[in-house]
């Protein structure tokens, strides 16, 4: 037999003297410190560069190569958070953050997350934590009623709702359910003939879900959209593509209209798309990840008209509903389709409650087994602010976006590239008048008359100009915006949605944009943007 060395004996014996990792008083002391730390962070968040200014690999150079052998104090750790971690953060909660889509937070959302994490239950089935399951079904019905969803999507009717991590998971789960429902009718050997449809503006989550679900990559359709339809998916074009696929021996399976696309917040017409899908027995999933939250406001509800004809509907409460990441709300008309596709029932999970068929086991509504108590934070948000205040928060963001849109329209150097629908404005800086095209077939610059540049060359020049312009603005650290390319046009996205953003911040962002427009146009040289 071997023998323990002295260091091992000392290490093992001293471990019995270590403070319990869940000591209540230490939890109280350190918890207060963390709350104070975060409160100070939000008080001062406006002072930080919105986008991190670090270079790739910065953190590995600053941190030790191995974990500490002995414990370190919370004070030391928080000091390192300040000096090492915060410089590497892009501050999504900054009032000057307008990039991507918002990840709006709130006190209620943060504290709900704290409660959820603090309880640390794993609610894979009803028995594992009844409150986690039952609260989820309650808040999903609450939220569904706020959206005026039909009873067919609610537990009070024949459907039901579940909290997923993200829209990617929601789309994958519904696509998997649609796949199995179809293959159970036609035979699993036909999986290679199934086709999934979206538009060229549909989120990439649909394509990834199709790959994971085993759909032939050649059978994924990203149908082209056009400016005259505000880049929405045309039901007529969808029908044409479906008919071509049927003629080729393929089988239409799934279509995903979007309410508020990522690039431009375009809205696909739900009802006409559902009419087409119904003819070919397709599953319709409505992805309202960004804009769905706004539909609790009566003036925006019409954007999801026709949802009663769809099979499933999802939105991200962690985007524009003041609930921390992650919290995707998914409603389905036929929960049994999800359960049949995703259910497993090993012996070690069997219990009387499940066998009674009187409870929901959410493990069968998702990909993973384990699941977080997400409903607690959504419940706290709904209760802490109420429907009236939540509507007013959303309206305030739309109002600020309208203000920004008005400022853009007042300056002839800019143009709105797509219509504003919600709280995001898409715009671009126009090339200077020194390259204006004249009717006589030539254009002028500072050096005199030069041959006419064709439309494509003008577009390339304008796109490069806006790319450089956006990079210059973001490099200041004062504001942060991102871009999209829609219809070949490079445009800047200004997405209002941070909980801390006020009108003064929007005015501040506009002044920065104006200042840098002055600079970049003042030294404009065609050669600078032609490469």
Swiss-Prot record:
Q: Which reaction does it catalyse?
A: L-tyrosine + H(+) = tyramine + CO2; L-dopa + H(+) = dopamine + CO2; 5-hydroxy-L-tryptophan + H(+) = serotonin + CO2
Give the record's GO CC terms: cytoplasm
* UniProt keyword annotation of Flavoprotein present: no
Matching PROSITE patterns = DDC_GAD_HDC_YDC
Name the organs or tissues of expression.
Predominantly expressed in the roots and stems, while a lower level expression is seen in the sepals and carpels of fully expanded flowers.
Family per UniProt? Belongs to the group II decarboxylase family.
This one is known as Tyrosine/DOPA decarboxylase 2
Whose protein is this, by species?
Papaver somniferum
């Amino acid at each position: 037999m071997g023998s323990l060395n002295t260091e091992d004996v000392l290490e093992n014996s001293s471990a019995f003297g270590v403070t319990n990792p869940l000591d209540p008083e230490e939890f109280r002391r350190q918890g207060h410190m963390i709350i104070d730390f975060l409160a100070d962070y939000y008080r001062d968040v406006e002072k930080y560069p919105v986008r991190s200014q670090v270079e790739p690999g910065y953190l590995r150079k600053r941190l030790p190569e191995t974990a500490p052998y002995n414990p370190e104090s919370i004070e030391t750790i928080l000091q390192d958070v300040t000096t090492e971690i915060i410089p590497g953060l892009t501050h999504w909660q900054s009032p000057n953050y307008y990039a991507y889509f918002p990840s709006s937070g709130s006190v209620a959302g943060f504290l709900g997350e704290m409660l959820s994490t603090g309880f640390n239950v794993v609610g894979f089935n009803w028995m594992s934590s009844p409150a986690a399951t039952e609260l989820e079904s309650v808040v999903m019905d609450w939220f569904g009623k706020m959206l005026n969803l039909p009873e067919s999507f609610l537990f009070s009717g024949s459907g039901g709702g579940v909290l997923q991590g993200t829209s990617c998971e929601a789309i994958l789960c519904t696509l998997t359910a649609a796949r199995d429902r179809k293959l159970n009718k036609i035979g699993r050997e036909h999986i290679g003939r199934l086709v999934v449809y979206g538009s060229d503006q549909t989120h990439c989550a649909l394509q990834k879900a199709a790959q994971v679900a085993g759909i032939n990559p050649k059978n994924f359709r990203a149908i082209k959209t056009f400016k005259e339809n505000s880049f929405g998916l045309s039901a007529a074009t969808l029908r044409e593509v479906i008919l071509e696929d049927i003629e080729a021996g393929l089988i239409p399976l799934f279509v995903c209209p979007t309410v508020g696309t990522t690039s431009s917040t375009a809205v696909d017409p739900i009802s006409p798309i559902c009419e087409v899908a119904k003819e070919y027995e397709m599953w319709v999933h409505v992805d309202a990840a960004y804009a769905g939250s706004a539909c609790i406001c009566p003036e925006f509800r019409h954007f999801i008209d026709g949802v009663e004809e769809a099979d499933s509907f999802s939105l991200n409460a962690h985007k524009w509903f003041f609930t921390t990441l992650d919290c995707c709300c998914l409603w389905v008309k036929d929960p049994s389709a999800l359960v049949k596709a995703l259910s497993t029932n090993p012996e070690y999970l069997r219990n009387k409650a499940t066998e009674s068929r009187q409870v929901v086991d959410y493990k069968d509504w998702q990909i993973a087994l384990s699941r977080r108590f997400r409903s607690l934070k959504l419940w706290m948000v709904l209760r802490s602010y109420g429907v009236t205040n939540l509507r007013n928060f959303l309206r305030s963001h739309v109002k600020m976006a309208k203000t920004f849109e008005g400022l853009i329209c007042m300056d002839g150097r800019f143009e709105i590239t797509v219509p504003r629908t919600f709280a995001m404005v898409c715009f671009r800086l126009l090339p200077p008048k020194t390259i204006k095209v004249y009717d006589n077939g030539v254009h002028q610059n500072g050096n005199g008359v030069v041959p006419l540049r064709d439309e494509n060359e003008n577009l390339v020049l304008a796109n490069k100009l806006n790319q450089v312009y956006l990079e210059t603005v973001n490099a200041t650290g004062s504001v942060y915006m991102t871009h999209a390319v829609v219809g070949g046009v490079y445009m800047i996205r200004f997405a209002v949605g941070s909980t801390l953003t006020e009108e003064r911040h929007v005015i501040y962002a506009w002044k920065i944009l104006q200042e840098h427009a002055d600079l970049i146009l003042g030294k404009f040289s065609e050669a600078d943007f032609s490469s």
